[in-house]
A protein has these predicted regions:
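Short helix-initiation/N-cap motifs at beta->coil->alpha
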Residues: 2-13, 158-169
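Extracytoplasmic/secreted envelope proteins and their assembly/folding machinery
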Residues: 12, 69, 73, 82, ...
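Beta->alpha turn/N-cap motifs
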Residues: 18-19, 23-29, 135, 162-164, ...
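Ligand-binding "clamshell"
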Residues: 31-44, 189-195
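A bilobed periplasmic-binding-protein/Venus flytrap-type ligand-binding module shared by bacterial periplasmic
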Residues: 52-71
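Periplasmic-binding protein-like
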Residues: 75-99
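Immediate post-signal peptide segment of exported/extracytoplasmic ligand-binding proteins
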Residues: 103-130, 148
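Short, polar/charged alpha-helical segment
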Residues: 130-157, 165-166
C-alpha cells in the first residue's frame, strides 16, 4: 500500500488518481459523495462527545466567560440544531450533544430547506464572527434562527477558511471571535505548541 499525503480540501477531486481516499464529511458531501453508498469504511461516531475529533466551538482563553459566546454555544446545543444536523446532512454529521432522538422532529425533509434558506438581519445586533471550514455550515442558519426566536440580539457572521489550520490563526489574531472548526485533539496540540 502506498499512502500519498494530499490536502484535505482536494481529496474528493483526486479520487480518479488513487484506489481509495480518506475523506471527511466536510469535503465529501459537497462533492456528492454519500457515505452509505460510496464508503468502504465509515468511522463510528461517538454521540456522547468523547471522540477527540468531534468539532467543538472555541474562543480565546481571555473570552472563555463571554456571555454572548456562551449564548451562541447554548443555541447550537438545541433540539432544533440536532434535528437539522440529522435531517440535512444524511449520514454525515451527528450531534455530539444531548438531544431527544425519540422526539417527533419538527425539522423534516419537507421543511429543512426553510432553515437552509433562513436569513437574519444584523441591524442593531451584536455581530460575532465564527470561523468555519468547508461548505457544510448550514447548521449555523438553524443556530441563528434559535438566537432570533429567543430574542438574543446576536448575529452570526461566518468567515470561511479553506484549510483547517487557518481558523486557529485567525482566532489568535482577533480576526474571528469563535472557531467552529476545531477538534479536541488539534486544540490540545495547538495549545501545547503555541500556549
Amino acid at each position: 500500500i502506498e499512502v500519498t499525503p494530499v490536502a484535505a480540501n482536494t481529496l474528493p477531486s483526486t479520487l480518479g488518481d488513487f484506489a481509495a481516499s480518506t475523506i471527511n464529511g466536510t469535503y465529501a458531501v459537497p462533492y456528492g459523495l454519500v457515505p452509505s453508498r460510496d464508503a468502504l469504511l465509515i468511522e463510528k461516531q461517538d454521540e456522547n462527545g468523547d471522540n477527540p475529533y468531534v468539532n467543538i466551538i472555541v474562543a480565546r482563553t481571555a473570552d472563555k466567560d463571554n456571555e454572548t459566546y456562551k449564548t451562541i454555544v447554548d443555541a447550537y446545543h438545541t433540539q432544533l440544531v440536532a434535528e437539522f444536523l440529522l435531517v440535512n446532512y444524511h449520514e454525515t454529521f451527528y450531534p455530539a450533544f444531548e438531544y431527544d432522538a425519540d422526539a417527533e422532529f419538527t425539522v423534516t425533509e419537507d421543511n429543512v430547506a426553510d432553515l437552509v434558506g433562513y436569513q437574519s438581519s444584523k441591524k442593531d445586533k451584536t455581530v460575532v464572527k465564527v470561523g468555519v471550514c468547508g461548505a457544510n455550515n448550514d447548521q449555523w442558519r438553524a443556530v441563528q434562527k434559535v438566537l432570533d426566536d429567543e430574542g438574543a440580539n446576536i448575529y452570526i457572521e461566518l468567515v470561511e477558511f479553506d484549510a483547517y489550520n487557518l481558523p486557529n490563526e485567525a482566532l489568535n489574531s482577533g480576526e474571528i471571535d469563535l472557531n467552529a472548526f476545531q477538534d479536541k485533539a488539534y486544540l490540545n496540540n495547538d495549545a501545547a505548541v503555541h500556549g
